């Protein structure tokens, strides 16, 4: 009812009193209706309007310059002011465009093969095409997939075919499109250097081998750590009364590292004061290691 002829709308903009005398002409037919109020040039019309300036000579010059109004268009029967909705077009199931003009019951009664022959596109076809594209990019072509799964699925065929079909059905990185991997949040990893990590240089400027460990197989166990260990053992042997940290039964020139769980034989001077009594027996006041703490 807003844009009907019976109840016309009011112009939202008010004409300036400093303008020339003007009239409001209805472009779609019918004369404008003058609203009585404070400004007589404030007009009210039913539809879109055009403001024409007139000369000061009079309304005759403006009427001569005004073009003839087109004849009014016939309106559809119904409520005044209501617009007719555009004709709706049915979309096909794939959403790619309007479907054929065949009636609904006819297309619903057709099978997928008949609809495909008629030129329609099914969403199943799109899914198959997308799956074949991904399989082709990852090295698994459609013939290989059909051979693996068989005509009746993974249950058909022998044990080897079922096993290969089960491995093929497992989600793995090989079945993911490489384009999807490159465009995902994880960028493709850079190839690692064949030389490995950059080796640090020692104080003398020579490259240190990463496999140099004391007692390891790298370069026969002769590295910086092995040299330090040999110097340590020589210094320990030179000191008088040093604690023998070698395992029991080991030779003097044995430089093998100590194994976990081996018993150490320490001299009497190197032992720490501890509990001398047997386990379960109370200690006497004069024994070593039973002195009260100074509090």
Curated annotation (Swiss-Prot):
Q: Which organism is it from?
A: Homo sapiens
InterPro entries given in the database record: DUF5555
Residue span of region Disordered: 1-111, 183-295
| Pro residues biased stretches | 68-77
State one Pfam family annotation: DUF5555
**What is the protein's given name?**
Uncharacterized protein DOCK8-AS1
Task: List the lineage, top down.
Answer: Eukaryota, Metazoa, Chordata, Craniata, Vertebrata
> Which intervals carry biased composition (Basic residues)?
1-13
Instruction: Give the encoding gene's name.
Output: DOCK8-AS1
Q: Where is the signal peptide?
A: none
- Taxonomy, superkingdom: Eukaryota
Annotated transmembrane regions: none
């Amino acid at each position: 009812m807003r844009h009907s002829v019976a109840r016309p709308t009011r112009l939202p903009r008010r004409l300036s009193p400093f303008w020339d005398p003007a009239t409001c002409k209805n472009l779609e037919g019918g004369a404008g209706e003058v609203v009585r109020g404070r400004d007589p040039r404030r007009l009210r019309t039913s539809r879109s309007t055009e403001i024409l300036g007139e000369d000061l000579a009079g309304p005759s010059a403006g009427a001569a310059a005004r073009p003839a109004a087109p004849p009014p268009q016939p309106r559809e029967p119904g409520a005044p002011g209501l617009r007719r909705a555009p004709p709706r077009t049915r979309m096909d199931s794939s959403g790619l465009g309007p479907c054929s003009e065949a009636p609904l019951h006819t297309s619903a009664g057709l099978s997928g093969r008949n609809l495909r022959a008629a030129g329609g596109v099914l969403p199943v076809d799109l899914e198959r095409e997308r799956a074949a594209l991904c399989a082709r990019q990852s090295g698994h072509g459609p013939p290989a997939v059909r051979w693996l799964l068989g005509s009746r699925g993974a249950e058909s065929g022998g044990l080897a075919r079922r096993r290969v079909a089960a491995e093929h059905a497992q989600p793995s990185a090989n079945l993911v499109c490489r384009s999807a991997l490159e465009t995902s949040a994880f960028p493709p990893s850079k190839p690692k250097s064949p030389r490995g990590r950059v080796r640090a240089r020692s104080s003398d400027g020579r490259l240190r081998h990463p496999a140099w460990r004391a007692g390891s197989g790298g370069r026969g166990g002769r590295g910086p750590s092995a040299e330090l260990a040999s110097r340590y053992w020589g210094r320990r042997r030179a000191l008088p009364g040093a604690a023998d940290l070698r395992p029991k039964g080991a030779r003097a020139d044995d430089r093998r590292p100590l194994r976990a769980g081996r018993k150490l034989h320490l001299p009497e001077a190197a032992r720490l004061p501890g509990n001398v009594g047997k386990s379960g027996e109370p200690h006497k006041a004069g024994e070593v290691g039973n002195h009260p703490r100074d509090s």
